Curated annotation (Swiss-Prot):
Protein name listed in UniProt: Ribosome maturation factor RimP
Family per record: Belongs to the RimP family.
Organism phylogeny: Bacteria, Bacillati, Bacillota, Clostridia, Eubacteriales
One Pfam family here: DUF150_C
Keyword Cytoplasm applies: yes
Length: 152
């Protein structure tokens, strides 16, 4: 079985983004209405600006045109992951330890599908949060999404 479009795109664009001193945070390939969108989220220490996004858009467009992993027409969007960036890689969970996060699960876990708390980190294969001095270990296998959440 071959790689998914997302895996192919990530493999093609990651080196280009890394060469610019940026981090590839996430890639989405979604259909909205009649149009397909390839969304690439990038970041760096101190955040990205419009020039970073424009530069990456041009570079990624060139390399994707060369390798052509996507058959149909799509719109390319490059942006910052925003304040509520997704946490996907092990490094994300290490880097954002102590930050407020929101975790959504694919199924009900201990009576809930949504958890918010301060990230303790990854322990074995659980995402560990602390809220009001209680710790909750959520199995990563049932996590649908994990994001930083903005504190007011």
């Amino acid at each position: 079985m071959g790689e998914s479009i997302m895996e192919q795109v990530e493999a093609i664009i990651a080196p280009v983004i890394t060469e610019q001193g940026l981090e590839l945070v996430d890639v989405e390939y979604v259909k909205e209405g009649a149009h397909w969108y390839l969304r690439i989220y990038i970041d760096k220490e101190g955040g990205v600006d419009i020039d970073d996004c424009t530069n990456v858009s041009h570079l990624v467009s060139e390399v994707l045109d060369k390798h052509d992993p996507i058959a149909q027409a799509y719109m390319l969007e490059v942006s910052s992951p925003g304040l509520e960036r997704p946490l996907k890689k092990d490094e994300d969970f290490e880097r954002f330890t102590g930050k407020l996060v929101r975790v959504l699960t694919k199924e009900v876990y201990q009576g809930y599908k949504e958890f918010t708390g301060y990230l303790v980190g990854l322990i074995e294969d659980d995402i560990v949060l602390e809220y009001e001095k209680e710790r909750m270990a959520i199995p990563r296998a049932i996590v649908d999404k994990a994001n930083l959440t903005f504190e007011f």
